[in-house]
């Protein structure tokens, strides 16, 4: 009896093995249930919906995005350092030239360049602070330090403009009240009284020195303007753009100083203090403009619509997005923070709608490097909006 039972068990085992080979491997339970759970909007051929992206795609892109910011930040920092070094050289050159030639305009420009050293230092420190990584106390980063630095620069520009205007007006008043035959001597004696008691008339033996240094300053500052301007536009840095226009204002003020030197050499001394007044006016304008832009960023003013329109076009080009509204943004230094409402088909699954939102985020940060973060609210397409789309 035991032999028969063992023989029967062996036969059953061989039959089961043979049946398994004929049928092949049994499908997994998830494979049987998946077709029943598929969204009616997903393709039936088994392919991935064309609006979906792998979840790792956003993480990988985020790493690449920050790496690009790091490389661009190093290049921008070098530009700030270059501007600081140039300001030191120009300040020394203008101060020596103003001392030798006795030109009020060049002396005023030297004082302006001295303030430029401080301003360039503040700009560099503000930029480095703004590029510090996020931490627990600053979850949105340190971008506002750029705006604070620009506001500090504007305040110092206003003070510098006031000091130069006061000195130039004082000299001009002395020139206008002097007798015509001694107008040159009196004006420069008055200027020397404000310069620690040293008398500096217009030294006609050094006109070439005065003109050469001024022309050199114009060339250097104009070159710094273009370098800084292009870097600021590429990175979207308001601080760099303001610093670029500051370099441009320095170049123009040097042109005015050049006119003042020429007027003094030609025997028209009142052009010298008038040039100083024009320089102070240009510095005043730069300070007001920089301060206004900085305050707008600090109070989270609305971003220019011309900056948001390309981003909206990028959103509407994403497959699955059927509408876009309430696109808003605020700036924090070089970074732009956005929030937007998008509309999708009402019968999509939650995961499909989420993947569309991730695709929108991916495309925005891919096409617009200045965007640091996007908050996306996903809603269903309303029947009233279908005809409009």
Swiss-Prot record:
Whichever gene encodes this chain, its name is MTP2
| Annotated localization | Vacuole membrane
> What InterPro entries has UniProt attached to this entry?
Cation_efflux (IPR002524), Cation_efflux_CTD (IPR027470), Cation_efflux_CTD_sf (IPR036837), Cation_efflux_TMD_sf (IPR027469), CDF_Transporter (IPR050291)
Q: Which residue ranges are assigned to the Vacuolar compartment in the record's topology? A: 103-104, 170-206, 272-275
Q: Which GO terms of the cellular component aspect does the record hold?
A: membrane; vacuolar membrane
Give start-end of the signal peptide: none
> Does this UniProt record's set of keywords contain Ion transport?
yes
Record-given protein name: Metal tolerance protein 2
What NCBIfam families does the entry give? CDF
Q: Pfam families under this entry?
A: Cation_efflux, ZT_dimer
Please give the start and end residues of each transmembrane region: 82-102, 105-125, 149-169, 207-227, 251-271, 276-296
Instruction: Tell me which parts of the chain lie in the Cytoplasmic compartment.
Output: 1-81, 126-148, 228-250, 297-389
Q: Specify the superkingdom.
A: Eukaryota
Its taxonomic path starts at: Eukaryota, Viridiplantae, Streptophyta, Embryophyta, Tracheophyta
């Amino acid at each position: 009896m035991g032999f028969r039972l063992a023989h029967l068990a062996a036969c059953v085992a061989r039959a089961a093995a043979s049946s398994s080979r004929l049928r092949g491997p049994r499908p997994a339970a998830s494979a049987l249930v998946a077709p029943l759970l598929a969204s009616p909007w997903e393709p039936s051929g088994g392919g991935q919906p064309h609006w979906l992206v792998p979840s790792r795609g956003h993480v990988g892109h985020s790493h690449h995005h920050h790496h690009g910011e790091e490389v661009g930040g190093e290049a921008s920092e070098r530009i700030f350092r270059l501007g600081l070094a140039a300001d030191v050289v120009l300040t020394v050159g203008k101060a020596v030239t103003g001392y030798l030639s006795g030109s009020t305009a060049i002396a005023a420009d030297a004082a302006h360049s001295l303030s430029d050293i401080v301003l360039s230092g503040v700009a560099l420190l503000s930029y480095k602070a703004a590029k510090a990584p996020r931490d627990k106390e600053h979850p949105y980063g340190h971008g506002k330090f750029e705006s604070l630095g620009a506001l500090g620069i504007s305040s110092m520009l206003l003070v510098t403009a006031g000091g130069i205007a006061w000195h130039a007006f004082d000299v001009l008043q002395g020139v206008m009240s002097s007798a015509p035959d001694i107008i040159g001597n009196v004006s420069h004696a008055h200027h020397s009284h404000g310069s620690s008691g040293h008398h500096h008339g217009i030294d006609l033996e050094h006109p070439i020195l005065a003109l050469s240094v001024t022309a050199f300053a114009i060339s250097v500052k104009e070159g710094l303007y273009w370098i800084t301007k292009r870097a600021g536009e590429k990175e979207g840095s308001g601080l760099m753009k303001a610093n670029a226009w500051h370099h441009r204002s320095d170049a123009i003020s040097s042109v005015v100083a050049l006119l003042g030197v020429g007027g003094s050499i030609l025997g028209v001394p009142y052009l010298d203090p008038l040039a100083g007044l024009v320089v102070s006016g240009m510095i005043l304008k730069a300070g007001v403009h920089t301060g206004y832009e900085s305050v707008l960023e600090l109070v989270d003013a609305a971003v220019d619509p011309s900056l948001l329109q390309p981003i909206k076009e990028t959103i509407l080009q994403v497959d699955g997005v059927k509408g876009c509204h309430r696109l808003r943004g605020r700036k924090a230094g070089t970074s732009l923070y956005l929030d937007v409402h998008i509309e999708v088909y009402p019968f999509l699954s939650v995961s499909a709608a989420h993947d569309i939102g991730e695709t929108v985020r991916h495309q925005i940060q891919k096409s617009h490097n200045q965007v640091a973060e996007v908050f996306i609210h996903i809603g269903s397409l309303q029947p009233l909006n279908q005809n409009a789309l």
